[in-house]
């Protein structure tokens, strides 16, 4: 199964999902599936910016010997983004409407991340 197929499957399975992306920790997009429209100017650019938040969280956890960061969520008035580490170099992120199914998004990230890691 291709990266895009996994990302598309996550988007189709989560109510309110507007995007699912596989990205490098450097913020470079590997692949993204967009669905619907978000009330945000540019979802792709926003997800790239969020990669910096994930990097900062990982560095803070390492500095304080708190262990590895598995997941980071960012909720704004217009969008909720949940990112999950796939490997030390990659993560996947789902963006959804504030009233979207956050629990299902988190579950699908958890079960899909190992599949993507095998394909990297």
In which residue ranges do the predicted regions lie?
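Non-catalytic interaction/Regulatory regions outside core domains
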Residues: 1-120
């Amino acid at each position: 199964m291709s990266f895009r197929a996994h990302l598309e499957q996550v988007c189709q399975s989560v109510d309110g999902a507007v995007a699912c992306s596989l990205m490098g920790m450097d913020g470079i997009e590997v692949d993204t599936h967009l669905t619907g429209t978000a009330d945000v100017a540019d979802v792709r650019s926003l997800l790239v910016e969020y990669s910096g938040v994930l990097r900062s969280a990982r560095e803070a956890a390492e500095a304080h010997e708190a262990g590895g960061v598995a997941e980071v969520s960012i909720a704004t008035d217009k969008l909720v983004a949940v990112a999950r580490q796939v490997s030390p170099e990659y993560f996947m992120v789902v963006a959804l409407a504030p009233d979207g199914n956050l629990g299902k998004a988190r579950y699908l990230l958890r079960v899909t991340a190992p599949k993507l890691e095998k394909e990297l």
